[in-house]
From Swiss-Prot:
Protein name: Uncharacterized solute-binding protein SYNAS_25580
GO BP terms in the entry: molybdate ion transport
Taxonomic placement: Bacteria, Pseudomonadati, Thermodesulfobacteriota, Syntrophia, Syntrophales
Superkingdom in the source lineage: Bacteria
Family designation: Belongs to the bacterial solute-binding protein 1 family. WtpA subfamily.
SUPFAM superfamilies in UniProt: Periplasmic binding protein-like II (SSF53850)
CDD domains in UniProt: PBP2_ModA_WtpA
């Protein structure tokens, strides 16, 4: 009799426990579904590696990525109204200028980079080019060089900034215009990574890229002085002398991009279709043992911890991300 009673009580509590488990909030369930990310082309290889690692941890999530120039990525949201969860930019200012406040609330700065002049063994004067003569070689007849579109890709306007700063640094009046005179319009491509294949096939001699892209694609490159490579935040006052005008939020509008050290930014779009899974990816990506480690391994220095400019912005982040971020302008 007692044993039967104990069994019934045990069964009752077992059923209660089962109901309690089944009624747990959805937050305890693993994220699932599709996460759409628009990102800078220079992040393609590290994000490819992150995608594999993240999806192995969360088999129910399908991370779908679209690479483009950063401004082009932002305009997919602002102009084309394409569904998107996450946008990652090679210049955090693109998010500030084009997405905040209408399409995003915050902007996490997660990595840096620097510009280099890439080439291959097939390039003209490959055995001659160095940090002291590159600007002369780019002016030589028959040398084919290019950069990405400044209106679509930060690497494009940064390439122009490097040339402006080089004119000042080397004290060569008119150098900027002289170098550009040897670059036809057809050598400007929508995003910087498109220039990689032109270099590798020998159809282009030199191209401006981020150092991380050069490392990832095993390209040779000329490293530039900190004063002009846009890679050292301590040189921001010097970099600010360079200014490039690019297309703005609306047709016919323009905005000025002022020289500054290369800083990448990432945000969650306000009407993200799958916010839960998107935040799970961001939590993985911003972790020093997760996505930031992949960035570092692929030649791109991450900020550890990542940063936002104000405490107010930090307070608007999802709780899971706040612990991975510091306040630092």
């Amino acid at each position: 009799m007692e044993k039967s009673f104990v069994k019934r009580v045990f069964a009752f509590f077992l059923i209660l426990a089962a109901f309690a488990f089944l009624s747990l909030p959805q937050a305890f369930a693993e994220p699932k579904g599709t996460v759409v990310m628009f990102h800078a082309g220079s992040l393609t290889m590290p994000f490819e590696a992150m995608e594999k690692e993240f999806e192995a941890r969360y088999p129910g999530v399908d991370l779908q990525r679209e690479a483009s120039g950063s401004q082009a990525a932002a305009r997919k949201v602002t102009d084309l109204n394409k569904p998107c969860d996450i946008m990652a930019s090679a210049d955090f200012k693109v998010i500030d200028k084009l997405l905040i406040p209408k399409h995003a609330d915050w902007n996490i700065r997660f990595a840096t980079n620097e510009l280099v002049l890439c080439y291959t063994d097939k390039s003209k004067f490959a055995k001659e080019v160095n940090a002291k003569n590159w600007y002369n070689i780019l002016q030589r007849k028959g040398v084919v060089w290019g950069h990405s579109d400044p209106n679509l890709d930060p690497c494009g306007y940064r390439a122009l900034m490097v040339l402006q700063l080089a004119e000042k640094y080397y004290k060569k009046p008119g150098l900027y215009e002289k170098i550009l005179a040897n670059r036809p319009v057809e050598n400007i491509r929508p995003k910087s990574v498109e220039l990689v294949s032109l270099l590798q096939t020998g159809n282009m001699d030199y191209a401006w890229e981020y150092r991380s892209v050069a490392v990832q694609h095993n390209l040779k490159y000329v490293s530039l002085p900190d004063k002009i490579n846009l890679g050292n935040y301590k040189e921001d006052p010097y970099y600010s002398q360079a200014v490039v005008k690019v297309t703005g939020k609306k047709p016919g509008e323009y905005m000025e991009m002022k020289g500054a050290s290369t800083t990448y930014g990432i945000t969650l779009i306000k009407n993200a279709p799958n916010q839960e899974a998107a935040v799970a990816f961001l939590e993985y990506m911003l972790n020093p043992k997760g996505g930031l480690k992949i960035l570092k391994d692929q030649g791109q220095p991450p900020f550890i911890p990542c940063r936002v400019p104000t405490q107010k912005m930090k307070s608007t982040l999802p709780e899971k991300l706040q612990k991975l971020v510091e306040v630092k302008d």
